[in-house]
A protein has these predicted regions:
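Acidic, glycine-rich active-site loops and adjacent beta-strand->loop/helix elements
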Residues: 33-34, 50-52, 84-90
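Short, charged, surface-exposed loops that flank catalytic or proteolytic processing sites
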Residues: 3-12, 73-78, 99-103
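Short, small-residue alpha-helix embedded
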Residues: 55-86
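Glycine-rich phosphate/dinucleotide-binding loop and adjoining beta-alpha-beta core of small-molecule
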Residues: 1-45, 121, 127
């Protein structure tokens, strides 16, 4: 994008769209307010997650979640949206039990089943 970090942080939607257009891809732009953009301009603003996810390995957990959803037949955009939501929810649940300071990526993994259960039981629509 050839711009400064502050420009990206202040323009997440625009920057994510530019990446999707430039590279013809779905973009997951991680931040304190994660944004997912599609090839045709759809934008999803994630509502879950917290500072507990700002740890080494957290992005790897997210990538694995998105990949697993794609492997189950979801579109890349839908898998990215749901993966980001569930990953953030797992982080929220872990933070509630362990504190933001004590959560490791491995803890987030342990909370994924509970985040899926909450998503299914509460009939949440992220799409």
């Amino acid at each position: 994008l050839n711009c400064e970090l502050n420009e990206v942080l202040n323009n997440l939607d625009v920057c994510a769209k530019q990446i999707s257009e430039k590279y013809n891809c779905v973009t997951v732009l991680k931040s304190h307010k994660t944004v997912v953009t599609s090839l045709n301009g759809e934008i999803y603003h994630n509502t879950t997650g917290n500072s507990a996810l700002a740890k080494a390995g957290s992005g790897d957990v997210l990538a694995g979640m998105i990949s697993g959803l794609i492997a189950q037949g979801m579109s890349i955009f839908d898998a990215s949206v749901l993966g980001v939501y569930l990953h953030g929810l797992a982080g929220d649940l872990a933070k509630n039990d362990l504190s933001a300071y004590g959560v490791l990526a491995s803890d987030t993994i342990r909370y994924i089943p509970l985040s899926i259960k909450n998503y299914l039981c509460k009939n949440i629509n992220v799409f």
